[in-house]
Design a protein with these regions (language model features):
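Short glycine-enriched, charge-decorated loop/helix-capping segments at active-site entrances
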Residues: 19-24, 83-87
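Radical SAM [4Fe-4S] cluster-binding motif and immediate context
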Residues: 25, 176-177
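Short glycine-rich His-centered loop
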Residues: 2-23
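Sequence-level motif detector for i,i+2 pairs with an aromatic at +2
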Residues: 1-2, 162
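Glycine-rich beta-alpha loop elements in corrinoid/cobalamin-binding modules
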Residues: 29, 36, 40, 45-175
């Protein structure tokens, strides 16, 4: 099975308000998604950016691990203070480019990418997961690994030929157990 490098694009040092508060939060959404893929047999690594200075810090990990997929999976938790900052979008764009430089398939899941998927696709992301992404991510990676068509996967945005394809959204999970 493929190997996945999970990360997120939140750098506390780039957010002066949160850096001043000195109350970092673990990237729970990223951890949940990574654990689901690991439980399903995938080789999973996590690169936590919270206390790092720059998106470039992921480059040595990309170089040594050579993951098949770079998954930038941002938390929905406290997203107004975290994921909707322009500087975090720019950090994600830089991470996308770094992933592409190392031949990764880049998958992004965030509230900002859901709202501005065209920008993320234009910057090189291969797939955007819209809404709750864990189940969509699992289905997408299994489908890609098996070289099956992705056109019927709910909750993804991707480039098909030269157009951006927006698939119908996946239903919100009702059973959380």
């Amino acid at each position: 099975m493929s190997n996945l490098l999970f990360s997120h694009s939140y750098y506390y040092r780039l957010d002066p308000k949160q850096w001043k508060n000195k109350t970092p939060f673990p990237p729970l959404g990223t951890l949940y998604a990574a654990s689901l893929l690991r439980e399903n047999g995938f080789d999973v690594s996590l690169f936590d950016t919270n206390l790092l200075d720059s998106p470039k810090s992921i480059e040595p990990v990309l170089k040594t691990q050579q993951p098949t997929y770079l998954v930038v999976y941002d938390d929905g938790f406290n997203y107004l203070t975290k994921m909707c900052l322009t500087i975090m979008r720019e950090a994600c764009f830089e991470m996308i480019q770094l992933g592409k430089n190392y031949n990764c398939t880049v998958i992004v899941c965030s509230s900002d990418a859901t709202d501005h998927y065209e920008d993320y696709i234009k910057m090189g992301a291969d797939y955007i997961l819209q809404g709750e992404g864990e189940i969509t991510l699992l289905e997408l990676v299994k489908t890609l690994d098996n070289k099956n068509p992705i056109e019927n996967i709910k909750g993804i945005v991707f480039r098909k030929d030269k157009a951006i394809q927006v698939n119908p959204k996946r239903e919100v999970l009702q059973d959380l157990d």
